[in-house]
Amino acid sequence: MSLAHQVLAVNNDLPIRTDKPVHSGKVRSVYWLTAEDSARLIKEKGYNVAADAPLAIMVISDRLSAFDCIWHAEGDVRGVPGKGAALNAISNHWFELFRQNGLADSHILDIPHPFIWIVQKAKPVMIEAICRQYITGSMWRAYSKGERNFCGINLEDGLQKDQKLSELLITPSTKGILKGVPGVPEVDDVNITRADIENNFAAFQFKQKSDIDQYEKLLKEGFNLISGALEELDQIFVDTKFEFGYVTDASGNDKLIYMDEVGTPDSSRIWDGENYRNGKIIEKSKEGFRQTLLSHFPDPDILLNKDRMPERQALAQDNALPIDVFMDLSSTYLDIAEKITGQKIVLSENPKQEIIDILARDFDVII
């Protein structure tokens, strides 16, 4: 089977029984199960949720998203081999560590296949919850231009690129475009301050103002737990993005939980510890691919300037990247996943058929 067929690039066309439109994200697709199938599975599987809780099947793909665009390689390769399985394996590992250490729950109820999560519907908080332990990326770009206030946080003079910060910083941005929020521009992923959130907590979908403290607590707890585990592997947890939402438990209580993936090479920067101590940055995340793109094209401003999005989308659509770029990134994903989980990531020959077979046999949701 060709490489193009081994990757799961299209994941929104599975014959899963649903009475709602399939939600297709940059990497994952979400199939909302019917009320009947949700209730049946909750009873059959013993999921610890309300009897009438809506369930969904979340299917990850191997697609490669960067700078808000989907990229492809020569030979019509439209995904990175092993990427989806690696991301899910890492998230599953961290969520299990969270559970063992008494942290908040996630929306994941079951993991029947490396590409599949059975999830409970959650109401998302409209914040990209970003934590930073080092000054790099967009924070460094702003700082190097003379900005000393970032997301409402005052930064001292004299900081150097990639140095460790004196404390863990929370630098949130909006999740999508929020309209009608005083002081918050109506653009995607715009930086915000804690004061913005406090003054408009309902607009960000917090149920109560005190939940802001809870989200920051969960953010720091999750970051510190992953950072400590990576430190034991001589890997540096540089920064990351968490997402949060509310679910209703079996007793009818609303609770704030972790959503989506955590601590992955897609949502985080991870550096090799030994090389960092020797003054060299070796990326163990998608950040390496982003840097490759910035050097690959003659005008990197297209990738960084949100006002040039049509040009950026055309760039991604019209340019097949060298296959070596995708294979190098595949090695990065698989290597860090195997290092974190301690287990080899087994690649599927035909992931789509495997998914269909399991969902038919064990869940009876294939039409």
Curated annotation (Swiss-Prot):
EC number: 6.3.2.6
This protein's pathway: Purine metabolism; IMP biosynthesis via de novo pathway; 5-amino-1-(5-phospho-D-ribosyl)imidazole-4-carboxamide from 5-amino-1-(5-phospho-D-ribosyl)imidazole-4-carboxylate: step 1/2
GO cellular component, one term: cytoplasm
Entries under InterPro entries matching the protein: SAICAR_synt/ADE2_N, SAICAR_synthase_Vibrio-typ
GO biological process: 'de novo' IMP biosynthetic process
Keyword annotations of the record: ATP-binding, Ligase, Nucleotide-binding, Purine biosynthesis
Pfam families (UniProt xref): SAICAR_synt
Regions annotated as coiled coil: none
Protein family: Belongs to the SAICAR synthetase family.
Protein's name according to its UniProt entry: Phosphoribosylaminoimidazole-succinocarboxamide synthase
Native source organism of the sequence: Saccharophagus degradans (strain 2-40 / ATCC 43961 / DSM 17024)
Gene (name only): purC
